[in-house]
């Protein structure tokens, strides 16, 4: 669908200020999330992690930083490995059964979904997301 202001096709979720595929810094995303204060709800800052936090302390400090900047709603999203037995884990080998990772999953609206079950458009959208290493 053509955006009336931009005059071109511009895909964005209704609960975000910056598209997930936009090549911008995580700080720009955080600053944009301050606009959520002017909404009645339904807006959320998605931080797509290219890798997990190195420690609990790193995750905690970053989360406190978001709160101190006035971000109301946010979600850390990272790819999760899945083996053929449908166990989810991080890494190359399943921590439950020892089988290798054969698929990736990602949280979509609060639940885990396998990438290989995505429709073409969702696969494309996921490939275009800007991922961050924090």
Predicted segment positions?
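Long, C-terminal-biased catalytic regions of enzyme "large/alpha" subunits
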Residues: 1-134
